[in-house]
């Protein structure tokens, strides 16, 4: 029997719905369940043929466990080795190389020194940074957000330099990005599976969570949808992700 497990966090709907859907298909020799993780021994399998990862971005223990599982025979979705090398700034930089339009973005050193470092650790870094050049490149309003992670945590919308430095002083050891604001007319959230199947949904991130997926969406031009579809595929093929969401503000 081939066993599929889904590893998840605080979400309550998708994991069980996924398990129920897989099991309802009654594929011979395949079953799915909510993953149960116990004793993890180096180089030893954990009892799953496939693990779908929905939480390791927030749990370092799971990241280590998934890499151990991957080298021990489990197919992990998404690739835990690639994920560990991934971050939002890299994704933006990659997008510029494959022709996908992204907002102007710069990455900044953390406001406070990382633990076990001091000013001598940063003698290669210019001080002060070229703030005028950075602000002229990005412009205001701008968004200020961590270079890794998600969930709209520690995200600021800034209108000027004074607001920037106030926010920067609140970020501690977080490595942050400053990003051009895009005033969008259309916004899409897109699922991509197996780097070939794309499901495009109209989305409004300004609404409360339960109202963000647009009900009864208006018809849109085929070219616009084709451009979004092609951008989703280009990003996921370049990133090597089997299961991912991509958002476009247009």
Residue positions per predicted region:
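Coil-to-beta-strand transition motifs
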Residues: 100, 195, 240-243
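A long amphipathic alpha-helix within ATP-dependent nucleotide-binding catalytic cores
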Residues: 209-250
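Conserved N-proximal alpha/beta basic substrate-recognition cap immediately N-terminal to
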Residues: 9-121
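Generic enzyme active-site microenvironment
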Residues: 51, 143, 245
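Conserved hydrophobic "DFG−1" position in protein kinase catalytic cores
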Residues: 157, 192, 248-250
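Beta-strand scaffold of nucleotide-dependent catalytic cores
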Residues: 167, 177-179, 187-204, 245-246
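Short, solvent-exposed loop/turn segments at secondary-structure junctions
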Residues: 11-13, 57-58, 83, 148-150, ...
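Active-site nucleotide/adenylate-binding loops and adjacent lid/helix of ATP-dependent enzymes
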Residues: 2-8, 70-73, 81-188, 217-230
């Amino acid at each position: 029997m081939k066993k599929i497990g889904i590893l998840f966090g605080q979400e309550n709907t998708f994991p069980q719905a996924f398990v129920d859907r897989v099991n309802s298909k009654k594929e011979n020799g395949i079953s799915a369940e909510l993953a149960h993780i116990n004793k993890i021994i180096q180089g030893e399998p954990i009892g799953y043929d496939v693990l779908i990862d929905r939480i390791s971005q927030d749990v370092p223990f799971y990241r280590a466990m998934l890499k151990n599982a991957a080298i021990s025979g489990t197919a992990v979705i998404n690739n835990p080795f690639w994920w560990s090398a991934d971050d939002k700034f890299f994704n933006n930089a990659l997008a510029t190389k494959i022709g996908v339009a992204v907002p102007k973005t710069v990455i900044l050193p953390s406001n406070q020194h990382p633990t076990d470092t001091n000013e001598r650790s940063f003698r290669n870094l210019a001080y002060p940074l070229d703030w005028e050049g950075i602000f002229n490149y990005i412009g205001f309003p701008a968004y200020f957000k961590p270079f890794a992670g998600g969930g709209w945590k520690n995200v600021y919308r800034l209108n000027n330099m004074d607001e920037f430095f106030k926010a920067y002083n609140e970020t501690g050891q977080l490595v942050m990005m400053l990003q051009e604001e895009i005033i969008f007319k259309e916004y899409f959230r897109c699922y991509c599976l197996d780097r070939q199947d794309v499901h495009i949904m109209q989305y409004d991130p300004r609404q409360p969570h339960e109202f963000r997926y647009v009900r009864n969406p208006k018809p849109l031009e085929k070219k616009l949808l084709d451009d979004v579809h092609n951008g989703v595929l280009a990003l996921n093929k370049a990133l090597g992700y089997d299961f991912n969401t991509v958002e476009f503000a247009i």
